[in-house]
Amino acid sequence: MRRYIEIYSIMLRNSLIREMSFKANFLLWMIVEILWFCGQIVFFSIIFGQVDRIGDWTKWEVVLLVGTHQMIAQLFQAFFFVNVANIPELVRTGRLDSLLVLPIDSQFAVSTKQFALDSIVNAALGGVVVCVSLSQLGIMPNPMSILLYLVALGFGVAVHYSIMLCLAAVSFWIVRAQGLVYGYFNFLNIARYPDVIFPRIFRMIFGWVVPVVIIANIPARLLIKSFGQPVPLMLHLVIASTIVFWLSRVFWKFALRHYSSASS
């Protein structure tokens, strides 16, 4: 475990050095993400100019949900997206060989090679929006609620990582699988919508089979006490995320057995 922590810290440091070597690019992408996030807030503001509620969600509760989704999506993008999205290219070019020969777990090797640290700033912006929303709602969460919320964010990132890893692993059979990976990255935006807008069957699918909707809805509900009890909410998130992470691990090992290296 200590060796993995040391390797992870080295990769983080190298990514920071690389990002600082291209400051203009770092700032440009950060600005683009901020503008995109502001666009989401404006989008829901326009909707609430016509209605008072979306289901049982008020305006500032939805803004809190959008801020929560921003934090999860940007943390996922900061620590995992670049690496997972690059797996199809590693397989196609045979450069995956250089990672498989390392004396570390192959999934760890492909998942921690590079980081997009500019996304951390955008995740912090989501946190600011959550705090403003809580203030507007007159909610002062207790330390336990805050702790559960932060833990739930981590599980949300794990769900995104697990699903995307499974899609990227399809590249062991389909040479160009980038479309699946980037398609899911766009699809995950449905997590920013209140779950009540979906029909019951889709709430079941997006809550258990492909649990993308719950990853932001459950953390948000943990802060808005009137929306549910914390124990069943956390239990749902923990069970769903654990299952999907385990399945991604199994599928990665299965897919790896079908890899034909460039040297073979």
Where are these regions (language model features)?
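Hydrophobic transmembrane alpha-helices and immediately adjacent juxtamembrane helices
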Residues: 1-264
